[in-house]
Amino acid sequence: SIGFDLYRKSGNEEEVKLNEEPITLSTNFQDITADRNKDNTYRLCFAGSDETLDTYTITAAQASAGLPYISIPLAGTTGVSSEYYYDANDASVGDLDGDGVYEIVLKRLLRSSSSTEDEEDESEAVQMGPWHTTLLEAYKLDGSFLWRVALGPNVPVGNLTSFAVYDFDGDGKCEIAVRTAEGTVFGDGTEIKDTDGDGKVDYRVEGSAHIHGGPEFLSVLDGMTGRELARTDYIALGKSEDWGDNYYKRSASYRVGVGCFSGTTPSILICRGVYGKMVLEAWDFQGQELKKRWRFDTSDGVHGDYAGQGNHSLSVGDVDDDGCDEVVYGGCCIDHNGKGLWNSRHGHGDALHLGKFDPSRKGLQIWSCFEACPFKVGAALRDARTGETIWDFPYSGDMGRCLVADIDPDSPGCEMWWYKGNAHSCTGADLGYGAGSSSMSYNMAVWFSNSLNRQLLDRSKIDASKEKRVFTIYRYEVTTINSSKSNPCFYADIWGDWREEIIQVTSDQTELRLFTTWYPTDSVSYTHL
């Protein structure tokens, strides 16, 4: 087994070894002897070796205050607009410079009088004043600002900007895949000009909440600089009516993801459409250009019955155990070759989860809820290989939320529940807790404490499943994003010891705060990210 030695240097004192025996039973260490009034630098080595694997310094200011977070100051935006403010929204992480440490990629949205959120039901009219309406920014965990991309007037406030951070070309550094348009200004100052020669680069329409046309692109950005590495045309708009309305809202249902559709290399997945026509495309990036792998189109004369089966999110995974990823998109699944794999015809919904939820069943399962299922089903557990329903909850309305997580040590596998519903076992048995005014959160699940069961993250607090408080995050002057969704900017296993860190923005929108656990544990696992 792998063992570690840990050393500490306090201020100008000599370095000391903290462990008497090699650390083999955990991937964390709680130092109870450190002088909090001094900077403490920790050095990690393999047991019996003096070769440094990593170092990290906890400053006296951090330690003396006893704060369970690190701060990343947000860059000012007066260079973008002296009149408008930009608020932090969704974030992701990736190793942008190849140094083995994650950086943060953050989306910032234009603040307005009626909404600062990335809401699915965004009804606010397009902002006509400022030129740049959505920002992407990159930060190092030490607070250093790396770059900014201003996506321009044709990528407005709303749920219209999804992005993926991944090492698409295998060079050890992550790129960013994002939808761009005329007017986008990249991290090196390069701008997408008038590409179609129509004499304009601003396609906003006064009084409308959505863009009515203009060239759209898929761009791949260099993670270190934010400059554009490659560009191709995005899935074409065509007619608004094809996508389910005549006012350009449903045609702006964009999704992005990452899938290993070849079985060996990652591809960029882009999607357009949920309620009517749906198009998905897979693109490969190998350092200089984008090459289309496949296209799935419900108007191709073959997959017409898949129309309207999309979702407000998507999940990617190998559902049929063939070594290649598939795309689970609401009521349907697209095979790794871009062909329809199955269509359960449940329709679309707000939440969808793919994973190994029932250990007694072969393969993966899907837990999701639906807005207006034709079978009058509010939430269902389906077999990911076939789309077959395993069990479901009858409901004729819009079931807006559901969640699945292993929260109960007394119940095998994962537990599942929905808005105001009791927790159920993976086989559908009612476990008798959760419903009512004190119902469990159905928002997000997180590993934060020393338990192998997950805890529930909602509204800047973490609770165990049966109303036991684990951490009150809102005490540290942070806020959530996306209005009623009450999301953090991001959460994942950033440090690598399998517990998850949580990134939230301060209430005054001046910095990100990355919260990490202080619970020691002797449970070990590979990193979850």
Where are these regions (language model features)?
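Beta-propeller domains
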Residues: A236-E241, D245-H424
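Beta-strand-rich modules
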Residues: D35-G48
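Recognizes extended acidic, P/S/T-rich segments that occur
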Residues: I2-N37
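Beta-propeller blade termini
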Residues: N89-L96, T161-D169, R255-F261, H312-V319, ...
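Extracellular fibronectin type III
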Residues: S49-A65
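Acidic/hydrophobic-patterned starts of short beta strands in beta-sheet-rich repeat architectures
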Residues: G98-R108, G170-R179, G263-C271, D321-Y329, ...
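Short, conserved, GDST-rich strand-edge loop motifs in beta-rich repeat architectures
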Residues: K107-W131, R179-H212, E371
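Conserved small/polar residues in nucleotide/adenosyl-binding loops
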Residues: T527-H528
